[in-house]
């Protein structure tokens, strides 16, 4: 009598696991990754906002796109990934004591790695960008706010 219910429960569990339904351990890993991404973005923002770099006006003239809608899901990280290459190129235009090319590359590689891990196998999402653009500081602030929002919903 209970065989059918048990088999249904097992089948449903397997289907959820196969489709990547979050488990408590994956949620814990996701929280750690989001926290790491948040810290990396904050560190990058500190370097960009450094008064020494503010004198390098070229870096602060470039525009970046942000998603048209408020980014609220991990799939929106694809939009960050698409703009990250431009940010790296812009930061390399203005080398200074606290923005050396090696550190920039390491930081960007780490951010890319984390974003790719958080995205998982999500490939069907297409970013829609706002018509208005933002400068580097505001761009980083928006993604920091995104990470804080995601992190707070997971706790």
Curated annotation (Swiss-Prot):
Residues linked to a glycan: 23
Xref: InterPro entries: 4_helix_cytokine-like_core, IL-2, IL-2_CS
The record's listing under Pfam families reads: IL2
Quote a single Gene Ontology cellular component term: extracellular space
Which cysteines are disulphide-bonded? 79-127
Q: Which domain of life is it from?
A: Eukaryota
Using the record, list the residue span of the signal peptide; answer none if the entry has no such feature.
1-20
The cellular location(s) given in this protein's UniProt record come to:
Secreted
GO BP terms in the entry: adaptive immune response; positive regulation of biosynthetic process
Respond yes or no to whether keyword Disulfide bond is given for this record.
Answer: yes
- Family the entry assigns: Belongs to the IL-2 family.
Q: How is this protein named in the record? A: Interleukin-2
Q: Which organism is it from?
A: Bubalus carabanensis
């Amino acid at each position: 009598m209970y065989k059918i219910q048990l088999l249904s429960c097992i089948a449903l569990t397997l289907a959820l696991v196969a489709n990547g339904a979050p488990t408590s351990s994956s949620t814990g890993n996701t929280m750690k990754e989001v926290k790491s991404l948040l810290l990396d973005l904050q560190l990058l923002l500190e370097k960009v906002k450094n008064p020494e770099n503010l004198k390098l006006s070229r870096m602060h003239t470039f525009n970046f796109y942000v998603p048209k809608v408020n980014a609220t899901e991990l799939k929106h990280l694809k939009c960050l990934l698409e703009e990250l290459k431009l940010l790296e190129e812009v930061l390399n235009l203005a080398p200074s004591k606290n923005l050396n090319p090696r550190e920039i590359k390491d930081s960007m590689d780490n951010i890319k790695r984390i974003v790719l891990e958080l995205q998982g196998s999500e490939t069907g999402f297409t970013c829609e960008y706002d018509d208005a653009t933002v400068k580097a500081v505001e761009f980083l602030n928006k993604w920091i706010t995104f990470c804080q929002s995601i992190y707070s919903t997971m706790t």
